[in-house]
Amino acid sequence: MILMKDIIREGNPTLREIAQPVSFPLSDEDRQLAADMMTFLENSQDPEIAAKYQLRAGVGLAAPQVDVSKQMSAVLVPGPEGEAPILKDVIINPKIISHSVQDAALAEGEGCLSVDREVPGYVPRHDRITLRYQDVEGVSHKIRLKNYPAIVCQHEIDHLNGILFFDHINKENPFAAPDDMIILE
């Protein structure tokens, strides 16, 4: 079971590396890692389990965050209360194959399980993306995402490219927003 102590923090060089593509069929080790990362997200979103194990809630966890430099991220974006998740999958070798010109940012900024401090500011992202990835069975998927799920996937893909969310924040004026950028509440 992945715990907070297993998640590496900013300053660890693995977080700044470009992760290696994953080959199929998955090794037993990679299959276990995928399952463990998704279990962490499920546990982190369950208030009882999260409190018991002192887990910070997360909607995404990339392999580099557990010190494994591979192109694999678990994503679990919850749906409205009592409904199925909006997005739940382990995305392997993901690629954004198209995106909107329209940018968006979360009003409250972004956070990260590998960053133990608040970094205020807007993180400009594409509002809509088309994502191609493989699941744990090697099946290719092409999905269109917008708003929050699109932002989550871009954050996770950044981890696979050695980029942290605060790299995107305007250093001079963290809350500067182009007129046409959507601010998502």
From Swiss-Prot:
Keyword Cell membrane carried by entry: no
Keywords: Hydrolase, Iron, Metal-binding, Protein biosynthesis
Active site: 156
Enzyme Commission designation: 3.5.1.88
Record text on cofactor binding: Binds 1 Fe(2+) ion.
Listed InterPro entries: Peptide_deformylase (IPR023635), Peptide_deformylase_sf (IPR036821)
Amino-acid positions noted as binding Fe cation in the UniProt annotation, renumbered to this chain: 112, 155, 159
Co-factor(s): Fe(2+)
Catalytic activity line of the entry: N-terminal N-formyl-L-methionyl-[peptide] + H2O = N-terminal L-methionyl-[peptide] + formate
SUPFAM superfamilies linked: Peptide deformylase
GO molecular function, a single term: peptide deformylase activity
CDD domains, per database record: Pep_deformylase
Any one Gene Ontology BP term: co-translational protein modification
Homology family: Belongs to the polypeptide deformylase family.
Purpose: Removes the formyl group from the N-terminal Met of newly synthesized proteins. Requires at least a dipeptide for an efficient rate of reaction. N-terminal L-methionine is a prerequisite for activity but the enzyme has broad specificity at other positions.
NCBIfam families noted in UniProt: pept_deformyl
Protein name listed in UniProt: Peptide deformylase
Organism annotation: Latilactobacillus sakei subsp. sakei (strain 23K)
